[in-house]
C-alpha cells in the first residue's frame, strides 16, 4: 500500500515504548493510517479495548479532532503503565489499567477500536457485546483479520463465525477492508 515513510511523532514514541517493553503485538502501520483517517471524522469520545503499549492509541491520537478524546483500556498493568508514559502530558488521552468491560459506563463511543479476537469473541455474542457501547452513526473497527474472499468467510479451515456475525448483523453496516495483502479490518457503522 502506498503511504509516506514518515510516522507521526506520537506513533514513533509508541513504537519506542513497545520495543523497550518487548511488546510486539501491535497494529500495523496500514491499519494505523486507517485509524487516523477515521479518527479525524469523529468527535466526542473514542475508545480502544486492548491498548498494549499504545501503538493503536498513538495512531488514533495522530488523527483526532480538537473536540475529541480517547479512552483506552489495557488489562495488563505493565503494558498500561508503559502506554501511559506516551500520553503523560496529553489531556486528550486517558490510559486505564482495567478490563474493557469497566468502560461500559463511559460510552457511548463515537469510534471503538478493538482486536478482532477480543473482547468480541463469538462466544460472547460478537456485536451483541458491543452494540450499546457505540453511539448511533458510531464506528467499530475490528483489527487482525486475514483477508477472505469466500462466503461464508473461512479462517484456519473453519467458518469465521465472528466475521460472519459482523458482516450480517443488520444493526450495523459493515465492510471488510484489506489494508495489506495479508491483513484486513472490519469497519462497522451503527445504524
Residue locations for each model-derived region?
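A short acidic, Gly/Pro-enriched loop at the edge of an enzyme's catalytic core
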Residues: 105-112
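C-terminal substrate-binding/active-site "lid" region of AdoMet-derived donor-dependent transferases
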Residues: 120-191
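SAM cofactor-binding core of SAM-dependent methyltransferases
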Residues: 23-102
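Rossmann-like AdoMet
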Residues: 1-26, 39-42
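Active-site flanking residues adjacent to catalytic metal/cofactor-binding acidic residues
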Residues: 47, 73, 114, 137-144
Amino acid at each position: 500500500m502506498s503511504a509516506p515513510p514518515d510516522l507521526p511523532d506520537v506513533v514513533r514514541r509508541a513504537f519506542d515504548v513497545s520495543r523497550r517493553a518487548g511488546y510486539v503485538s501491535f497494529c500495523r502501520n496500514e491499519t494505523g493510517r486507517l485509524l487516523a483517517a477515521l479518527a479525524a471524522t469523529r468527535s466526542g469520545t473514542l475508545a480502544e479495548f486492548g491498548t498494549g503499549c499504545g501503538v493503536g492509541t498513538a495512531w488514533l491520537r495522530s488523527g483526532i479532532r480538537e473536540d475529541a478524546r480517547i479512552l483506552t483500556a489495557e488489562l495488563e498493568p505493565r503494558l498500561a503503565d508503559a502506554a501511559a508514559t506516551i500520553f503523560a502530558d496529553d489531556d486528550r488521552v486517558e490510559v486505564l489499567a482495567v478490563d474493557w468491560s469497566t468502560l461500559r459506563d463511559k460510552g457511548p463511543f463515537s469510534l471503538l477500536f478493538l482486536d478482532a479476537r477480543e473482547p468480541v469473541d463469538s462466544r460472547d455474542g460478537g456485536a451483541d457485546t458491543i452494540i450499546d457501547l457505540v453511539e448511533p452513526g458510531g464506528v467499530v473497527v475490528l483489527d487482525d483479520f486475514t483477508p477472505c474472499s469466500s462466503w461464508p468467510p473461512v479462517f484456519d479451515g473453519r467458518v469465521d463465525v465472528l466475521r460472519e456475525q459482523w458482516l450480517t448483523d443488520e444493526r450495523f453496516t459493515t465492510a471488510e477492508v484489506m489494508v495489506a495483502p495479508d491483513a484486513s479490518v472490519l469497519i462497522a457503522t451503527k445504524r
